[in-house]
Design a protein with these regions (language model features):
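Membrane-interface helix-loop-helix regions
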Residues: 40-42, 129-188, 221-222, 290-301
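Membrane-interfacial loop-to-helix junctions in multi-pass inner-membrane proteins
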Residues: 51-57, 85, 112-133, 150-157, ...
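Short alpha-helical catalytic segment bearing the HExxH-like zincin motif
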Residues: 58, 120, 182-187, 327
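Hydrophobic alpha-helical segments with transmembrane-like composition
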Residues: 168-224, 229-235, 368
């Protein structure tokens, strides 16, 4: 006869034959599981693999875009350290992408015994290309109208080939004011999407894929220590995010990380540690990259983690849903707000620029998502496996 106590299931007659002490021990474990609140239960590997939507990730995306907007709008009086910390929002984006894309690819392979590269690239293209090229065309029109003869405008035209081919992160230096420079992060992600699925197919196993990422991480870390700009330009959070996905997909890797990342308070503790790593000067990029991946892991392994309530709150979830549009449009929104404040005689030196940019970016991104992006997103369903 099978008896279940909470998460413990066993054959009661068989266990009774093992002796009263063994049966009593198992019975006490079952009762403890019954008495233990659900939000304290540890997630098993099977539970993790059964999760279809990591709902906390939208909240993390919201933090990412709000941090980026803060970086571009923070008033001078907050200081360079606090203002520049917002740039790490891109690193969080990277870690989320590395983790989520790798997880989706691994689960597709587990279900269908193969990864459909064509379907993957079509889905990614429908998500990224329409808005990216739409905003790029808008920038071309605005530069032609407003800055065609300026040095900055001419530089924009010269860089168009790199913006169009998603190589701006490699060939467009940040030297003064560079129009559309923020697209470097989208370029880095597109390069990851282009290379990583093929690598996963070629290496053939989780262990070899993980070893390959560890080698890349070590080489890039060595390059950073040596001061090599090429290696410093590699987005390490994408690598650590992908490595996290590989480890969690494996039962051994999951069991290794679960005691550290799967506790209810892991997300809060690691989030505080990440905040310190970002704010304290001199922390190496690879350390921050590991923290970003650990935070993503802590917010996905344990479904009812301590930070979940505010990460899945409706405003955070919604901002996370439209975060790509906010990222692509926030610099235009910032410029509109700065010029509007100037036109009414209001100096743009306080927090109002950040607040107004967030509000306008949210409205514009919502309109873009509803009336433009969603049309292309519906086409993705034909390529979903």
């Amino acid at each position: 006869m099978l008896v279940r106590f909470g998460a413990v299931q066993y054959d009661s007659l068989r266990n009774l034959r093992l002796g009263p002490h063994r049966a009593t021990l198992l019975l006490s474990q079952g009762l403890a599981a019954v008495q233990k609140p659900n939000h304290w239960m540890n997630t098993t590997h099977a539970d993790y693999l059964a999760i279809k939507k990591f709902d906390s990730l939208d909240g993390l995306r919201a933090i990412s875009i709000l941090a980026v907007i803060w970086h571009h709008t923070a008033p001078d009086w907050v200081g360079a350290t606090l203002a520049h910390a917002g740039a790490q929002g891109v690193s969080l984006f990277f870690s989320i992408s590395g983790f989520l894309i790798t997880t989706l690819l691994l689960r597709e392979k587990a279900r269908h015994s193969r990864i459909d590269l064509k379907a993957f690239y079509v889905r990614r293209s429908l998500r990224i290309f329409p808005l990216y090229y739409g905003v790029l065309l808008l920038y071309v029109a605005l530069v032609t109208l407003l800055e065609r003869d300026s040095v900055t405008g001419q530089a924009f035209y010269n860089n168009l080939i790199y913006f169009t081919t998603y190589t701006s992160n490699l060939f467009v230096p940040l030297d003064g004011r560079v129009i559309f420079y923020f697209a470097w992060s989208v370029a880095a992600e597109e390069q990851f999407y282009l290379i990583w699925p093929t690598v996963l197919i070629l290496v053939g196993s989780l262990k070899r894929a993980a070893l390959a990422l560890i080698v890349v991480l070590l080489v890039c870390t060595w390059g950073e220590v040596q001061g090599n700009e090429f290696f410093s330009a590699v987005p390490l959070p994408i690598i650590t995010g992908a490595l996290l996905a590989l480890l969690l997909h494996s039962e051994k890797g999951f069991n290794l990380l679960q005691p550290l990342l799967g506790r209810r308070w892991s997300s809060t503790v690691i989030g505080l540690g990440l905040t310190l790593a970002v704010l304290v000067p001199g922390v190496p990029n690879y350390v921050k990259a590991l923290f970003f991946a650990a935070w993503v892991g802590a917010c996905t392994i344990q479904v009812n983690h301590s930070a979940r309530a505010w990460l899945v709150a409706r405003p955070m979830a919604y901002i996370g849903t439209i975060s790509y549009g906010m990222y692509m449009l926030h610099m235009l929104c910032k410029n509109v707000m700065v010029k509007t404040l100037g036109a009414i005689g209001q100096a743009a030196g306080g927090l109002e620029v950040f607040v107004l940019t967030v509000l306008l970016s949210t409205v514009v991104a919502r309109l873009s998502f509803r009336y433009f992006e969603s049309w292309f997103l519906e086409l993705k369903t034909g390529f979903t496996r």
